[in-house]
A protein has these predicted regions:
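N-terminal recruitment modules of adaptor/scaffold proteins
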Residues: 1-52, 56-67, 71-102
């Protein structure tokens, strides 16, 4: 079995103070990194990974305007809840949604 991770995409994002952003103290600016198995929020200032979420823990996701959101299940390291992420424009939010679903 092959256990390596392949980085697919990286987006500059801002986690908003809503849902898990507040309850897990995740609000702030990050790079959201998508690999073939997970999503990682990497702090802009320290370049340190804050959390890594397995893709199988994402129950559903979507986008509206300049926001991308994910509903995470109980198996996520954060526990169940929503994560709201702001990006620079609507097209980026749509691209994130399509890439993560793919």
């Amino acid at each position: 079995m092959n256990n390596f991770f392949l980085l697919v995409s990286t987006w500059p994002v801002t986690v908003k103070p809503r849902g898990l952003g507040t309850s897990k103290n995740l609000t702030g600016q990050y790079d959201l990194q998508l690999s073939n198995k997970s999503l990682a929020l990497v702090r802009k200032d320290t370049k340190e990974p804050m959390i890594e979420l397995e893709l199988i823990s994402v129950r559903r996701c979507g986008h509206t305007d300049c926001f991308f959101y994910m509903e995470l299940g109980r198996s996520a390291v954060t526990g169940a809840g929503e994560l709201w992420i702001q990006v620079d424009d609507q097209i980026i939010a749509q691209n994130m949604h399509e890439a993560i679903l793919g």
